[in-house]
Amino acid sequence: MTGTAHAAFRRLFNEIGPVDQVGIEERVAKYTTRSIKKGSKLFGLKLAASMVDLTTLEGKDTPGKVASLCQKALHPSDDPEVPTVAAVCVYPSMVKYARRALGEDTGVRIASVATAFPSGQAPLKTRLAEVRSAVTDGADEIDMVINRGAFLAGEFQLVQDEIAAVVLACGSATLKVILEVSELETYDNIRAASFLAMRVLRPNDFIKTSTGKTSLNATLGNNQVMIEAIRDFYLDTGTPIAMKPAGGIRTAKQALQFLIAVKETLGDEWLNNTRYRFGASSLLNDLLRQIEKERTGAYQAPYYFSEAAESY
């Protein structure tokens, strides 16, 4: 890191404060030991299901695969009390097929990764054109990636300016800003990137942990750093920012631990799919299995539930 970058980081941390890493780890360790009563557990499982962005982001995606994903999103279970998921998440080229499969006013939104996902390594003009194309084809939400190289070089104004340009390109579509926490490496960097994004986002736009394409994705630790940043930003500005951990959350047990973290850090106002999401696919089937177990007392075999894509 250059001397200029060091100076930029020092100035930012003087504004927002560093992360207490020991405190973060102590807090997240407690979330894993919480016991949940039966009624609360069933509520939490259904809530988590309603927060899923059901995702397929593979090179072998086809219109037929996306249509199947959309059917899973609309009808995750034969149990009428199980909610639909929050959204499906697909590549920009698949948005029109998702819109065709979902129709209008179903309650399931269409999210699309854009801005040269997952690397972000394309000219800004190209990235913005991809955003506009996805929105024109029917995307309700855009998941963008930040310029990690610029961030790590201390070029914070460039990072913010690019996010602000994507906000404008989104129009009325919700924006989710992916930090790619594995490449940021430290909790301090994750907090700093969160603040840079939040300062140019609109109420209920999102910050998001990961693309799901690297070795380290969402953890209770990096989720905690980001939701504490959201809390601090909200207390300072009154602007509510939403959160999406993505990648690596595959079990109902994990999802409930993340929801405990949200409740204890941000409160009940964030316990809805407007302000909290899970970027996942395999998670949904485990949630459905656990819901069935709570309802009937018996586990269903994994093949009982239709398969969604397993890319996250």
At which residue positions do the language-model features occur?
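Charged, compositionally biased N-terminal leader segments and the immediate start
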Residues: 1-48
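N-terminal beta-loop-helix "entrance" segment that forms/cooperates
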Residues: 286
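Alpha/beta enzyme core
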Residues: 39-49, 60-83, 93-243, 250-281, ...
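A short, histidine- and acid-enriched strand-loop-helix "catalytic/donor-clamping" loop
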Residues: 57
